Amino acid sequence: EFLLTKIGRQQGRPLTVTDSAIRLLMSHRWPGNVRDVENCLERSAIMSEDGTITRDVVSLTGVDNESPPLAAPLPEVNLADENLDDRERVIAALEQAGWVQAKAARLLGMTPRQIAYRIQTLNIHMRKI
């Protein structure tokens, strides 16, 4: 409502959104923040001839395109495998724990402080998720 009023003021005309357009917007996974929603509404308003944002207009902005498929999850590595070196074992635990150090430490039977030390000494670069 707020964004619609703001965009309408910028364009100098009243804007409305159909129920089907709202449902489409609500069902979309917005990876960014409110600016992504605002940009989509601005593009939709510009493409709307009469100030009514419909599902078809929102679709033209690419909102209903399917998200790219996620990469297949890596198979879990047996952390007790004796063939793994220390670095591989720590990285495998981090991957299984979603790169959360405390969870990886639990998987390896370590304290968070111990795994942090291993990450530093083994020169493992932490992924930002």
From Swiss-Prot:
Residues 101-129 bind DNA. Interacts with sigma-54. The keyword Transmembrane does not apply. Keywords: Activator, ATP-binding, DNA-binding, Nitrogen fixation, Nucleotide-binding, Transcription, Transcription regulation, Two-component regulatory system. Required for activation of most nif operons, which are directly involved in nitrogen fixation. It comes from the Bacteria. This is Nif-specific regulatory protein. Pfam families: HTH_8. One of its GO terms (molecular function) is ATP binding. The lineage of its organism: Bacteria, Pseudomonadati, Pseudomonadota, Gammaproteobacteria, Pseudomonadales. InterPro entries: Homeodomain-like_sf, HTH_Fis, P-loop_NTPase, Sigma_54_int. One of its GO terms (biological process) is regulation of DNA-templated transcription. Residues 1-46 form the Sigma-54 factor interaction domain.
